[in-house]
């Protein structure tokens, strides 16, 4: 059982989603926000599944592009995220996540392939195979030590309604082309209209909630960065807490207490970054040597 403590907002990494139909300005808006979040353009990476759309805005700055082509299996997205992390990126733009869901080799195709294998067709059991694969993709986004901006295509959503006994199809808004509920995983979710104006659909930061539509800029990213850094700095908190580590059990609890600082190494293990590992190792050796004396 965990110990009861006062609520305290930690410094965080943003998880921001941009949704719009084709031509809504998702890539451009994502790059501007990313620049506000990053210390420089070369600390931004775009995982590009949109046939080179990220390169269209190279005049903005010297950002990095990792092109991802079919098949769009979730694991390929995960590997791309880890590659960007290991390269020292501060912001990762995933443009877009739609292909992970509905693209060639994506989740919908994986599900259909599972159904096709069955003698007695059962879509429910096929989803039991797909859901864990998709969840690993979500976890890679949520657990990343980088700020992450996702773009997703949206389309007009319709539903059948009964109007005095007559069936009719009515437009009910826009639907994101990804698994239902993805936006609930995010810190902030913005819908872009045809004029590239953003409307907030979800905002845990309360920075934009209730505001009129606005055009995302570099300043938008700077505002978000300031919010992220206004909480308790977990890295500094961990380093300060090392002086209180006097038993092996104290060191064993660090990964649980500071789970947000963990990264995924090339072997797929969740570990602290190298600088923190060195600090922890040095303190552990200091404690061990003291006990031997």
Description of each model-found segment:
Residues 94-130:
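Conserved P-loop NTPase nucleotide-binding/switch module
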Residues 54-57, 100-108, 157-163, 197-201:
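Switch/connector loops and helix/strand junctions flanking conserved nucleotide-binding motifs
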Residues 21, 131-221:
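Phosphate-binding/switch region of NTP-binding enzymes
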Residues 37, 41-91, 117-120:
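Nucleotide-state-sensitive switch-loop elements of NTP-binding domains
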Residues 1-20, 24-26, 35, 51-54, ...:
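Interfaces that engage single-stranded nucleic acids at replication/repair/recombination sites
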Residues 9-11, 35-40, 83-87, 140-144, ...:
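Conserved catalytic network of the ASCE P-loop NTPase/AAA+ motor domain
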Residues 29:
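Hydrophobic positions on the alpha1 helix immediately C-terminal to the Walker A/P-loop
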Residues 15-17, 43, 91-93, 147-149:
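Residue-level preference for the first positions of well-ordered beta-strands
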């Amino acid at each position: 059982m965990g110990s009861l403590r006062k609520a305290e907002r930690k410094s965080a990494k943003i998880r921001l989603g941009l949704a719009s139909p084709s031509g809504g300005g998702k890539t451009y808006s994502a790059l501007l926000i990313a620049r506000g979040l990053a210390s420089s353009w070369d600390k931004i990476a775009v995982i590009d599944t949109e046939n080179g759309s990220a390169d269209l805005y190279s005049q903005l700055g010297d950002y990095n592009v990792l092109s991802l082509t079919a098949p769009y299996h979730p694991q390929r997205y995960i590997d791309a995220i880890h590659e960007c992390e290991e390269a020292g990126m501060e912001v990762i733009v995933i443009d877009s996540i739609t292909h992970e869901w509905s693209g060639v080799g994506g989740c919908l195709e994986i599900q259909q392939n599972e159904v096709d294998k069955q003698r007695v067709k059962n879509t429910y059991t096929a989803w039991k195979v797909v859901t864990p694969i998709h969840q690993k993709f979500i976890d890679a986004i949520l657990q990343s030590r980088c700020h992450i901006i996702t773009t997703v295509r949206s389309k007009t959503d319709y539903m059948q309604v009964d109007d005095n006994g007559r069936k009719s199809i009515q437009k009910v808004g826009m639907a994101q082309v990804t698994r239902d509920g993805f936006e609930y995983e995010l810190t902030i979710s913005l819908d872009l209209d045809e004029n590239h104006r953003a409307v907030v659909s979800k905002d845990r930061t309360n920075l934009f909630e209730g505001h009129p539509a606005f055009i995302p800029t570099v300043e938008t990213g700077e505002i978000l960065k300031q919010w992220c850094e206004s909480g308790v700095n977990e890295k500094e908190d961990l380093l300060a807490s090392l002086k209180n580590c006097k038993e092996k059990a104290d060191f064993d609890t660090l990964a649980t207490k500071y789970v947000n600082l963990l990264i995924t190494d090339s072997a797929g293990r969740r570990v602290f970054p190298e600088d923190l590992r060195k600090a922890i190792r040095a303190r552990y050796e200091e404690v061990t040597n003291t006990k031997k004396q």
